[in-house]
């Protein structure tokens, strides 16, 4: 996971606890989780759009090739 071991993760958690405090830490964790989830959804959406565009392009290229083959015959 990003080359982070247990000692690094513990250090990050301790720093977060010092910076945000124990009362605010769950709220920060929820917000961070929500942000990561939204980012993943957005990247998945873009990936799917690119795949769909590639499929459409492949379909158009194949039909153009077929037309060229028919015209050459």
Swiss-Prot record:
Record localization: Cell membrane
A biological-process GO annotation: protein transport by the Tat complex
GO cellular component: TAT protein transport complex
Location (main, coarse): membrane
UniProt-listed InterPro entries: TatA/B/E (IPR003369), TatA/E (IPR006312)
One Gene Ontology molecular-function label: protein transmembrane transporter activity
Region (Disordered): 52-73
Record key words, sorted: Cell membrane, Membrane, Protein transport, Translocation, Transmembrane, Transmembrane helix, Transport
Domain of life: Bacteria
Ranges that cross the membrane: 1-21
Gene3D superfamilies, alphabetized: 1.20.5.3310
Protein topology in the membrane: Single-pass membrane protein
Role summary: Part of the twin-arginine translocation (Tat) system that transports large folded proteins containing a characteristic twin-arginine motif in their signal peptide across membranes. TatA could form the protein-conducting channel of the Tat system.
Subunit structure: Forms a complex with TatC.
Family: Belongs to the TatA/E family.
Protein name: Sec-independent protein translocase protein TatA
């Amino acid at each position: 996971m990003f080359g982070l071991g247990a000692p690094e993760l513990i250090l990050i958690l301790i720093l977060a606890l010092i910076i945000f405090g124990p009362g605010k830490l769950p709220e920060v964790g929820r917000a961070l989780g929500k942000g990561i989830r939204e980012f993943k959804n957005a990247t998945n959406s873009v990936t799917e759009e690119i795949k769909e565009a590639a499929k459409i392009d492949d379909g158009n290229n194949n039909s153009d090739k077929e037309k060229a083959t028919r015209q050459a015959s």
